């Protein structure tokens, strides 16, 4: 079990850091009273491995309860919990700018100057910062870079291309475009096996249809360009912190052409070491509905 205590200065990026940890599979709890950490830790142990990565956001918002944090940390240490403290900070200038941009007051100076609250918070958090395992100064960190840093420190060591979950999805336009699609490709320009009597009963997963679709010159040109486009887009999506990508391939009924093309794209991405899954949404939909217009 791995505990990460996320703390630091208000406005330094704890929310974004927590989102990044959540994307990495951490069970995240925001603003838990520090005194409850021991009980929470024991509850996680009793989950029997169902909760094995935890991120607790603890900051000055806890008010008088914040002073209980050190006692709780000692409890974790005494009971051999694998815990780490992540401390986020930024320069006064950057913090003031962020507060002004969001039109928020500082929690330690709700009716006064922002800089006064920042100075007070720095003083109160000095000891906690000294105990931190990792300190990140976000003054010059774009969100993308912070995500990369969090992944480097607290990820599971997967290659960067494995941090984006890709789904290749075939569908039929007659049943609607999948609403969660990121990229949609229309392959109805490819000759349709439906109109060839000996191919009509099969699907794009069967060799006769697959061989027919992939042998078309239109298919070869399309797959070549699609492969190049995916190879260009995916690393850029990863850099921007995107965690899920749905690539939808559509034909008329979602049984022949889109299935064969989706299978080919899936294999191509798999060979390039991307984390990819395959789904054929409408492959049997026409049969189930008794509609043979594919």
From Swiss-Prot:
Q: Which Pfam families match?
A: PapZ_C, RapZ-like_N
Q: Which Gene3D superfamilies match?
A: P-loop containing nucleotide triphosphate hydrolases
What InterPro entries would the database entry show?
P-loop_NTPase (IPR027417), RapZ-like (IPR005337), RapZ-like_N (IPR053930), RapZ_C (IPR053931)
Disulfide bridges in this chain: none
Q: What GO MF annotations does this protein's record show?
A: ATP binding; GTP binding
Q: Which UniProt keywords apply?
A: ATP-binding, GTP-binding, Nucleotide-binding
* Source domain of life: Bacteria
Query: Where are its TM segments located?
Result: none
Which residues are GTP-binding? 59-62
User: Which residues take part in binding ATP?
Assistant: 8-15
- Main role? Displays ATPase and GTPase activities.
**Sequence similarity:** Belongs to the RapZ-like family.
Q: What is this protein called?
A: Nucleotide-binding protein CPE0354
């Amino acid at each position: 079990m791995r505990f990460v205590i996320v703390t630091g200065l208000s406005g330094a990026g704890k929310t974004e850091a927590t989102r990044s940890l959540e994307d990495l599979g951490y069970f995240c709890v925001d603003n838990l009273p520090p005194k409850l950490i021991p009980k929470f830790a024991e509850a996680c142990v009793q989950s029997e491995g169902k909760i094995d990565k935890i991120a607790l956001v603890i900051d000055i918002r806890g008010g008088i309860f914040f002073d209980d944090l050190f006692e709780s940390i000692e409890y974790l240490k005494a009971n051999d919990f694998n815990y780490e403290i992540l401390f986020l900070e930024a320069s006064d200038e950057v913090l003031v700018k962020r507060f002004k941009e969001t039109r928020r007051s500082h929690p330690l100076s709700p009716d006064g100057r922002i800089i006064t609250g920042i100075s007070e918070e720095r003083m109160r958090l000095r000891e906690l910062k000294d105990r931190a395992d990792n300190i990140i100064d976000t003054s010059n960190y774009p969100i993308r870079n912070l995500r990369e840093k969090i992944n480097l420190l607290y990820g599971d060591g997967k290659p960067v291309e494995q941090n984006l979950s890709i789904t290749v999805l075939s569908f039929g336009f007659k049943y609607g475009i999948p609403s969660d699609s990121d990229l949609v490709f229309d392959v109805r320009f490819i000759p349709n096996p439906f109109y060839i009597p000996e191919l009509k009963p099969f699907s794009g997963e069967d060799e006769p249809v697959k061989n027919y679709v992939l042998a078309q010159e239109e298919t070869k040109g399309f797959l070549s360009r699609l492969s190049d486009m995916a190879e260009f887009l995916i690393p850029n999506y990863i850099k921007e912190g995107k965690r899920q990508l749905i690539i939808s391939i559509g034909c008329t009924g979602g049984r022949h052409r889109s299935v064969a093309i989706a299978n080919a794209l899936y294999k191509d991405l798999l060979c390039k070491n991307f984390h990819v899954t395959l789904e054929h949404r409408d492959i049997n939909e026409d049969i189930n509905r008794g509609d043979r217009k594919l």
